[in-house]
């Protein structure tokens, strides 16, 4: 979330998809 915007977005996306 600090310097990993893409990583954070991926985590949220995975949660939303699943």
UniProtKB/Swiss-Prot annotation:
Keywords: Cytoplasm, Methanogenesis, Transferase
pH-activity dependence text: Optimum pH is 7.0.
Domain of life assignment: Archaea
Any single Gene Ontology cellular-component annotation: cytoplasm
Temperature dependence: Optimum temperature is 60 degrees Celsius.
CC cofactor note: Binds 1 coenzyme F430 non-covalently per MCR heterotrimeric complex. Coenzyme F430 is a yellow nickel porphinoid. Methyl-coenzyme-M reductase is activated when the enzyme-bound coenzyme F430 is reduced, probably to the Ni(I) oxidation state.
Subcellular location field: Cytoplasm
Protein name: Methyl-coenzyme M reductase subunit beta
Source organism: Methanosarcina thermophila
